[in-house]
Amino acid sequence: MFSKILVANRGEVALRVMRAAKELGVKTVAVYSTEDADTYPVRYADEAVCIGPAQANQSYLVMSNIIAAAKTTGAEAVHPGYGFLAENAAFARACADNDLVFIGPSPDCIERMGDKSMARETMKACGVPTVPGSDGCIDTASEAKAFADTVGYPVLIKATAGGGGKGMREVHDPTDLESQYQAARTEAGAAFGNDGVYLEKLVLRPRHVEVQVLADDFGNSIALCERDCSVQRRHQKLIEEAPSPALDEELRRAMGVAAIKAVRAVDYRNAGTIEFLLDERGHFYFMEMNTRVQVEHPVTEQITGTDIIKEQLRIASGEPISCASRAPFVPFGHAMEFRINAEDPAHGFRPCPGTITKFEPPAGPGVRVESYVRTGSRISPYYDSLVAKLVVYGQDRDEALARGRRALDEFVIEGIATTISFHRRVLDNAVFCAGEATTDFIETQMGDVL
């Protein structure tokens, strides 16, 4: 095991990694911008190094500053968290070039799975189901039209790089295709520095179901059950749960087998997630692979009894997965995660940075809160709006729902608007409570908050 690691991130995920490292006896180095100098993760770490001003492109995205901080402090490895440089192959290579272990997959894997069209072709080749789509990038609007005319509308235009809903457009009417194609390319280029896009047949009213995977250097590749992330707004997840209420044991096993097939096809190492679309007939299709730890990993931890961050550290340090002998995993209980963002649902989820004048998280049986804030903390306008992740666990889904209602009612955050009230409304919605939410849930069931 490492003796010291650097955490190349901020906020909630930085603290999560540091806590896991501390339990393993590993010292931690925080990097921070001037904007984050007074945040709790900076104080929590054994050492901290300022890497630049508030703007991420002058601090958290500056590879050379992060590498220098790791070398100066004697860190042996770098954990990228999620976001920022977590899925940047050049950063993973820079770590290796400087004798630092990147706590994640190889640069080649990041590159191969980060190119969405290449990933799709790889999955097709190894027998993982995929949605009918274009062969590689679509370079012109006329090519896009030819593909759409062949498979039929609606179609989905997707960026080959990145994720989070950027560079993605649904097209239901042929007259909108050219404008949406150009808009997707423009957005993708601005967000990822790569304006490449490809097209897929749009699966209507699907569920978003993903499988958490771990793989080590000893031939162990395991699936840690699935998560249902269907409650989304503009392709951004808001609520996640595990296991999915839509899966029976046969379908769970089939998705797990497909996920392991995907992992082995690219010789993957460390933690990753295979995302699938699940249609109304129970057919599933590969969507993409996330080559990092996910925001929503705690719900998987709750139903499997694993610590995914610790497993990442073990794998990267050359140890085998500690829970490999327990595979195949059968979920026990039910967990849900609610992303508490500094956004105002009453005004179109407008960002609401500012100072938190009161922060009183819920507690009690089956309640877990992952957050880096305290009363007096300031939510910066420069970064992601995530304030906290509320995770609840129950013996079954009904208990998890009841616990979620109770915990949301107890959660007090004052000084800024948050999504707490939105989540509370979702838990009173009959469709969600019945476990029938699909990716259009917010548009069809919560339209008044859009």
State where each predicted segment sits.
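ATP-binding N-terminal substructure of ATP-dependent carboxylate-amine bond-forming enzymes
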Residues: 1-126, 138-146
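ATP-dependent carboxylate activation and anion-phosphoryl transfer catalytic cores
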Residues: 7-26, 48-50, 71-73, 89, ...
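A generic structural signal for short coil/turn motifs at secondary-structure boundaries
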Residues: 57-58, 110, 167, 297-299
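Conserved beta3 strand of the protein kinase N-lobe
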Residues: 133-134
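Active-site neighborhoods of enzyme catalytic cores
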Residues: 154
